From Swiss-Prot:
PROSITE patterns listed in its UniProt record: G_OBG, GTP1_OBG, OBG, OCT
EC number assigned by the record: 3.6.5.-
Obg domain boundaries: 1-158
Protein name: GTPase Obg
Enzyme class, first EC level, given as a word: hydrolase
Species name: Staphylococcus carnosus (strain TM300)
Length: 430
């Protein structure tokens, strides 16, 4: 089964909790605080594995949760950092934020990595909060929650050359003739329902990867006939080989087929219409093929490179392979995907973690309670040990320093009003 798109949920590990502890040793009457920090939570990392070809593994497991860091211990011993969760993906995997569709990473090279969900920082032990005014603090910090994100994985095959055309024009037969690939071949439409790759060697020793893509139909650029899934794999190819049934054996007009497929390539975007293209006039062993080819050449002109072949009888196959190899040599230094990504503002390196901003919003619930939300305040809430009075007082000071108290007053909050943050409720006190 070929799986080229899947949506999964990632949860990075929470940081381990810091601990409140004191140094208690004989002959050391005032040992002071000795609580260690918690360990860092595991991040979720994607890594390219050249041995993989599909996203099949993610079809059966859609949720991945990384481990949390170990808690701190006494004697200022810090908790162990959790081992990162590394998920292997095939070359050509694009990772997007499922909600915003922002491209987080484009993984194309063996061993390339991207941190997509960052593990939480370990909570600080009480020894970290010691000051001259408070030399023995009796509170510590919980670990920071790990990031949680839903992402879409898209696989775009890494092939040098893509075979495109209507169903049953002979693409699979051509691939089977020029490589050792064994695609499914049949006398009916859409025999090929998944992309097939084959390594092709020319008689003069050059080689390239050829992809046989499922047949396109009119409206493919708008998703008709799974067109989006199929056209996605053309994006990374350097050369497009447009296969046409020049005999018209299916009752179609070769010229109309040519125009329709090129229109779909242009409509899809990604500048596919600008890729170097070779037109393969296939099925030249059948009746009417020669006459149709002459009419076709008259209509498209001399600027279109046309190679007449018969994949069935293997006529002119070597000439086609030489033409493809020459075209690849001509465009070997051109990175079409880079140009497309720059036009779209895509970062192809990796996802960079952006720290939370100290912004917040205040809304009202139906029961008139004030609801404070925002990444920074919610992060502080999760990292506060509300079983410790000193920790609660520290949280209140943090709210004041962020300007939340003043903002609540401006919204009309009075003494005794209820304030909610995540699952917690507080009384507003003047």
């Amino acid at each position: 089964m070929f799986v080229d798109q899947v949506k999964i949920l990632l949860k990075a590990g929470d940081g381990g909790n810091g601990i409140t502890a004191y140094r208690r040793e004989k002959y050391v009457p005032f040992g002071g605080p000795a609580g260690g920090d918690g360990g860092r939570g595991a991040s979720v990392i994607f890594e390219v594995d050249e041995g993989l070809r599909t996203l099949l593994d993610f079809r059966y497991q859609r949720q991945f949760k990384a481990k949390r860091g170990e808690g701190g211990q006494g004697s200022n011993m810090h908790g162990k950092n959790a081992e990162d969760l590394v998920l292997k993906v095939p070359p050509g995997t694009l990772i997007k934020d499922a909600e915003t569709e922002e491209v987080l990473a484009d993984l194309v090279e063996a061993g390339q990595r991207a941190v997509v969900a960052k593990g939480g920082r370990g909570g600080r032990g009480n020894s970290r909060f010691a000051t001259p005014r408070n030399p023995a603090p009796d509170f510590s910090e919980n670990g920071e929650p790990g990031e949680e994100i839903e992402v879409t994985l898209e696989l775009k095959l890494l092939a040098d050359v893509g075979l495109v055309g209507f169903p049953s024009v002979g693409k699979s037969t051509l691939l089977s003739v020029v490589s050792k690939a064994k695609p499914k071949i049949g006398a009916y439409h859409f025999t090929t329902i998944k992309p097939n790759l084959g390594v092709v060697s020319t008689p003069d020793g050059r080689s390239f990867v050829l992809a046989d893509l499922p047949g396109l139909i009119e409206g493919a650029s708008e998703g008709v006939g799974l067109g989006h899934q199929f056209l996605r794999h053309v994006e990374r190819t350097k050369v497009i080989v447009h296969v046409i049934d020049m005999s018209g054996s299916e009752g179609r007009d070769p010229l109309e087929d040519y125009k329709t497929i090129n229109k779909e390539l242009e409509s899809y975007g990604q500048h596919l219409e600008d890729r170097p293209q070779i037109v393969v006039a296939n099925k030249m062993d059948l009746l009417d093929a020669e006459d149709n080819l002459e009419l076709f050449k008259e209509e498209v002109g001399d600027d279109v490179e046309i190679i007449p072949i018969s994949a069935y009888t293997k006529e002119n196959i070597d000439q086609l392979l030489y033409a493809i190899a020459d075209k690849l040599d001509e465009y070997k230094d051109v990175d079409f995907t880079k140009e497309d990504d720059e036009a779209l503002g895509v970062n192809r390196v990796l996802y960079k973690h952006t720290p939370s901003q100290d912004t917040f919003t205040i809304t009202r619930d139906d029961d008139a309670a004030y609801v404070v939300s925002g990444k920074a305040i919610e992060r502080m809430f999760k990292m506060t040990d509300f079983n410790s009075d000193p920790a609660v007082r520290r949280f209140a000071r943090q709210m004041r320093s962020m300007g939340i108290d003043d903002a609540l007053r401006e919204r009309g909050a009075k003494n005794g009003d209820i304030v909610r943050i995540l699952g917690g409720e507080f009384e507003f006190v003047e």
